[in-house]
Amino acid sequence: MLAAPRAGCGAALLLWIVSSCLCRAWTAPSTSQKCDEPLVSGLPHGAFSSSSSISGSYSPGYAKINKRGGAGGWSPSDSDHYQWLQVDFGNRKQISAIATQGRYSSSDWVTQYRMLYSDTGRNWKPYHQDGNIWAFPGNINSDGVVRHELQHPVIARYVRVVPLDWNGEGRIGLRIEVYGCSYWADVINFDGHVVLPYRFRNKKMKTLKDVIALKFKTSESEGVILHGEGQQGDYITLELKKAKLVLSLNLGSNQLGPIYGHTSVMTGSLLDDHHWHSVIIERQGRSINLTLDRSMQHFRTNGEFDYLDLDYEITFGGIPFSGKPSSSSRKNFKGCMESINYNGINITVLARRKKLEPSNVGNLSFSCVEPYTVPVFFNATSYLEVPGRLNQDLFSVSFQFRTWNPNGLLVFSHFADNLGNVEIDLTESKVGVHINITQTKMSQIDISSGSGLNDGQWHEVRFLAKENFAILTIDGDEASAVRTNSPLQVKTGEKYFFGGFLNQMNNSSHSVLQPSFQGCMQLIQVDDQLVNLYEVAQRKPGSFANVSIDMCAIIDRCVPNHCERGGKCSQTWDSFKCTCDETGYTGATCHNSIYEPSCEAYKHLGQTSNYYWIDPDGSGPLGPLKVYCNMTEDKVWTIVSHDLQMQTTVVSYNPEKHSVIQLVYSASMDQISAITDSAEYCEQYISYFCKMSRLLNTPDGSPYTWWVGKANEKHYYWGGSGPGIQKCACGIERNCTDPKYYCNCDADYKQWRKDAGFLSYKDHLPVSQVVVGDTDRQGSEAKLSVGPLRCQGDRNYWNAASFPNPSSYLHFSTFQGETSADISFYFKTLTPWGVFLENMGKEDFIKLELKSATEVSFSFDVGNGPVEIVVRSPTPLNDDQWHRITAERNVKQASLQVDRLPQQIRKAPTEGHTRLELYSQLFVGGAGGQQGFLGCIRSLRMNGVTLDLEERAKVTSGFISGCSGHCTSYGTNCENGGKCLERYHGYSCDCSNTAYDGTFCNKDVGAFFEEGMWLRYNFQAPATNARDSSSRVENAPDQQNSHPDLAQEEIRFSFSTTKAPCILLYISSFTTDFLAVLVKPTGSLQIRYNLGGTREPYNIDTDHRNMANGQPHSVNNTRHEKTIILKLDHYPSVSYHLPSSSDTLFNSPKSLFLGKVIETGKIDQEIHKYNTPGFTGCLSRVQFNQIAPLKAALRQTNASAHVHIQGELVESNCGASPLTLSPMSSATDPWHLDHLDSASADFPYNPGQGQAIRNGVNRNSAIIGGVIAVVIFTILCTLVFLIRYMFRHKGTYHTNEAKGAESAESADAAIMNNDPNFTETIDESKKEWLI
């Protein structure tokens, strides 16, 4: 089969236009005539009927609106729920509205009613709206007219109005009018054997576009509606399977290749109700719209072909027998079709005119044959009593039922002569029979059969019992029938109860095992006699309560499926439930993502660098993706990887063709776009190694190589350059190998050259494809590498606006959240009230507000009356701290949560309006004269879309973009003495006065000391001139330059060593004062103080275990005058006191030594004894008051000039785990998924790289992995030490820090460095030269 061009977005748009036009053409009888004519006022009295009337003057013929004939309207003899008024239009009409009025000048009117409709006066269908059997609001007096426009028109000959409620001071009184217009359509009846073919004129039909429309009704759950196929494997089939509509399509498959074109889509449910259903199939290439009863489903076919090739014919009603297995295994359609239209050809008209030749088997007729079955509809309070034949020795009952409930009573009957009773029920989706026996020792016989019988399909039950024998058969399957030969005596009773038991409802002592049945039954047979339900309806014989005869009003609450993201829908009679397992979403309808929207959000929850799932648009359509979050800097890097990060050799053998290198990312392009759009900065490294392989062909040629970015746009600049500048980095910085070219590779040298750099114009990223040329010549070689996409910052997370006064507000377009709406944001305020946001409709609305200092309210109205949910906080919310609000409303429930307070939930009513219809603009901050919000709002997200508060505030008078005061809420995240600094977008932690590093000042900074190594930190800064040098006298401190005397100090550090004795820390002075921390030969720790006033230093010896055991140990020693508090590891703090004669000041501190003491002058004997050979091990997070000597040595800080090092200092954290924020419990941690293994999680675009964070691990695997990790770590450490020793004088410091104009080598470089998004081309003609 020949391939055709793919259909793009235009195809989908065209299908939508065609669908709209076709739907209008189908539902409207004329483009010039509005379907709004009164249909009742002109009808004769004989067209009206009713359940009963008080008298002739109250007969239904007087029930015409605004008429006063008779008693002024219809009133039944009894005002109860079994009354109805019926109108026969004479033929089918299209109905668009209904109006009611009470009985003239009386106290009789209906306040609520239902509308039923039918083509035949049988098999009634209730009017549905918003997925429910609709109850129309009626009148409030006898003379006012209340009209309701139908949400969707219906086609019927008969209309029946059933009063549900009426004026309590009167009785039922009614006058009606129905509005619409005439309707006519050709109807064809299919008997299950006949097939109607439409044969193609040229015996073949090749189409790129198809439009097929028809209506059908049937009482069968299986049957082929239409079918066509071609010899090349193409086919199209529309059929019923289990009362659902299935469209199967194949535009072509490749028998020898991987192209598999079969596509199958299922929609609808309960289509065997013998009511009309409309179907429209629209195809444009591979784009398909399938519309069933106004519900459209869009999809694309599998494979790569666009044309549908059919041979000879397309058939309606079945598949003609062809000898193929598919033609004999499928049932033909049995029922009626009308208005069959195939690509503009009216098939029904051709059939009526006998232009088509049906198959010889079966009969084709042009009137719809109605079924003989009469259904009966049960609710939770229903029962149906029918008489039986008394004292028979054979108990026989059969019926069909359909339901969604797994449990319910089906049949109950007492045996005569007090022999017992029989109960047939549905228990856990199985049919069970329980025979209670009173005349034998065996008290009960139980048998059951079937499974999954609550699937909404019709199921047949047959039960027969006689002496010592019983048999239960389900769905006619005799092979699996259940039998019992238990002792049993049978004498039938006189009453059979179906669906419920009257005595049970009256709380009698005769109880049954299951609650009342909710569903439908038909074809009820008792004692081998078919029950006449029309006679039962007239209560002769039999009785009933709350049943609807000749109607099956079962509703499939899973169609349409409100469970999003592939959630599985299950249902009972009046509700549905979504199972969201393994979807990545949660909530009543699987609407809310369990993942954070960005790495920035994970950072502020205290997480560290690792792989994480993020969901950039939350509840939006994109879905989650796995990224690496690098949190080692102030701003978090989000890293998205692909499959081409290693250097790839590019080979081409054809000078006329380029080599195309495609990059496959771990996410979709839409997901990546969401990341780049919200990021503050993005970059991607790209490198091209070349040997006789030109790159951009500068300065004037057409590029040999280019890259493709977002939206499939080609770009002709390289890393280090910018849009519109056809140069490489060396061309911008004017340091190319050959100055005549703007890229190193363009010089076409035979030696290897390189052009590389970062692409940083984020609107063009990511790189999705690189097209390489000029690699086909003799000696040409090229190697390409592209780094991962790296993005920094999250503008959405900190997108904020300040509301300076209560009368100010921001406005946005109308919020679209008809059936599912979620809203989340942060706020901070000092006022106790204010409206956060509000959106109004004609009657509907949605509003979030701060009602008091401790109350947040979420209120809305979808047409059922206002609903309000309130969350009350135990502490004030107007504390100028950030608080988070999450509100959600869907067809199942509404919820509100503030911070981590318990979520408040309000269930939606099972019946009523479900759509939130809004029309006004969305107002943020208050509107309409209400008390507006005064404070700050940020990160406002509605249905996955972040509202740009900052940009709207910039163009709105009186507003301020952004918020301040982030440290008031997040300052506690800065640990270990880190200082919180306010930023325009968020905050950062200043760790300069701590011994820690990292985003939250919680990363240890330490180093490994080899034997003989030492570090000295001079408290006095080095001399800066000759005068300073000459003025210094050894051991005679200059009071202006020396460190001040100390009355208190604090020392904190961690160490690990296996060698003792050694000096850990020593602080000298310009006097004889000193402070030392050392490890004695026994491995115990000693602290020595000499502050003067005593003959010997004061020693603190610890009695703890050996501290030279290779494990990390922490020391925290604090002195205030003579009081010393020492804390080691996890042991309790211990207080010590200096002798009374001791001085309280540490005079003139001079230097701090780590590892070894190198000091002139007299040194304490103990220190001198333990000073050789020196400390060997690891020291970390060393801090003396506000001084961090190790950090000053390893980081470029203001204190680095005070440090002198002997030896090579190797950075290490000494095996200590970085401190983090307190971890959340698994119950509240949204990414803690014990049930979801990352290796098996079936998420889109997941290549399996990296691992999502896991809290649960396999213990055996952990032990084995730990042993392996220790071995590998030992080997790596050894290699690191060897390499550092060999190359200790060859280290260089690299930075990607942007250079300013002062350091730029050219104007191009300065512009690029200062504005990476600069797009103007810079060439020689635009440069200025100084002459």
UniProtKB/Swiss-Prot annotation:
Main location: membrane
Domain EGF-like: 554-591, 964-1002
Matching SMART domains: 4.1m, EGF, FA58C, LamG
Record's keyword annotation contains Signal: yes
Intracellular or extracellular location(s): Membrane; Cell projection, Axon; Cell junction, Paranodal septate junction
InterPro entries the UniProt entry points to: ConA-like_dom_sf, EGF-like_dom, FA58C, Fibrinogen-like_C, Fibrinogen_a/b/g_C_dom, Galactose-bd-like_sf, Laminin_G, Neurexin-like
Free-text function comment from the UniProt entry: Required for gap junction formation. Required, with CNTNAP1, for radial and longitudinal organization of myelinated axons. Plays a role in the formation of functional distinct domains critical for saltatory conduction of nerve impulses in myelinated nerve fibers. Demarcates the juxtaparanodal region of the axo-glial junction.
Subunit structure: Interacts (via C-terminus) with KCNA2.
Segments traversing the membrane: 1263-1283
Cytoplasmic-side positions: 1284-1331
Gene Ontology CC annotations of this record: juxtaparanode region of axon; membrane; paranodal junction
Domain Fibrinogen C-terminal: 592-798
Disulfide bonds: C35-C181, C336-C368, C520-C552, C558-C569, C563-C578, C580-C590, C936-C963, C967-C980, C974-C989, C991-C1001, C1178-C1214
Residues bearing attached sugar chains per UniProt: N289, N346, N363, N379, N436, N506, N507, N546, N630, N735, N1116, N1198
Topology feature Extracellular, residues: 28-1262
Record has Glycoprotein as a keyword: yes
Naturally occurring in which organism (per UniProt): Pongo abelii (Sumatran orangutan)
One GO BP: cell adhesion
Lipid bilayer topology: Single-pass type I membrane protein
SUPFAM superfamilies named among the record's database cross-references: Concanavalin A-like lectins/glucanases, EGF/Laminin, Fibrinogen C-terminal domain-like, Galactose-binding domain-like
Entry protein name: Contactin-associated protein-like 2
Domain Laminin G-like: 187-368, 373-552, 799-963, 1023-1214
Modified residues (Phosphoserine): S1303, S1306
Keywords: Cell adhesion, Cell junction, Cell projection, Disulfide bond, EGF-like domain, Glycoprotein, Membrane, Phosphoprotein, Repeat, Signal, Transmembrane, Transmembrane helix
